[in-house]
Amino acid sequence: MTKESADNYYNPLMLWGYDVFVQVLTNSFWWRCSTKGILVPFFLDNSTTNHMEVGAGTGYFLRAKLDHERSKLKSSDDKTLWPQNLTLVDFHERCMNKAANRISPVRPNRVLANIMEPIPLKGQKFDSIAIMYVLHCIAATPEAKGRVFANLKPFLADEGTLFGSTVLGKGVKHNLIGGFLMWLYNYIGMFDNWDDGKEDFLKPLREHFEVVESEVVGTVLLFKAEKPRH
């Protein structure tokens, strides 16, 4: 997705309805990868107190993490240890503001950037980097999207984990409504993923990281990578 199309689609009304339509309906029935059953546990398991969130969206997963950590507290007076350091990276300021407001009073760092280019954030290392439901929105060939991992690698600590998810267009079977949504989203420019297959992402991940794990659930690729190559 280009900056111009993001401005058109990620408007306040769309962001308001995103969680219901995507996180509840689309993921469960049409992408067939449950938000509560698959994606939230995946995020909780891999995110740390020193975290970079790439493509913050509505802040849905960040809020789930914050609520999860708060549920562990013995008293309402206790303060959660999450996050100690949180940075949001997005090329759309409206999404970053939405996500930041959702996890108030947490005050994350905000970096406005295009992840297809080097990210203007020097000298920082994170124990976890998440890129959830971002890659299928990038207007680029599958091969070009691999640059994202090269651009994120410098910010991952040696013992850290980069993880994410993306809707695939190749090598998976979409149901009737899922196929229609794929056509619609690609037609209007919200998605650019008809040619995105599992190996298109695993290949560059293996080039940049020593340990790569993946799983396809429904039409969604889940991946995690560790031990960045130097």
Curated annotation (Swiss-Prot):
<dbReference type="InterPro" id="IPR029063">
    <property type="entry name" value="SAM-dependent_MTases_sf"/>
</dbReference>
<dbReference type="GO" id="GO:0008168">
    <property type="term" value="F:methyltransferase activity"/>
</dbReference>
<dbReference type="InterPro" id="IPR013217">
    <property type="entry name" value="Methyltransf_12"/>
</dbReference>
<protein>
    <recommendedName>
        <fullName>Methyltransferase aurB</fullName>
        <ecNumber>2.1.1.-</ecNumber>
    </recommendedName>
</protein>
<keyword id="KW-0808">Transferase</keyword>
<comment type="similarity">
    <text>Belongs to the methyltransferase superfamily.</text>
</comment>
<dbReference type="GO" id="GO:0032259">
    <property type="term" value="P:methylation"/>
</dbReference>
<comment type="function">
    <text>Methyltransferase; part of the gene cluster that mediates the biosynthesis of aurovertins, fungal polyketides that exhibit potent inhibition of adenosine triphosphate synthase.</text>
</comment>
<comment type="pathway">
    <text>Polyketide biosynthesis.</text>
</comment>
<keyword id="KW-0489">Methyltransferase</keyword>
<dbReference type="Pfam" id="PF08242">
    <property type="entry name" value="Methyltransf_12"/>
</dbReference>
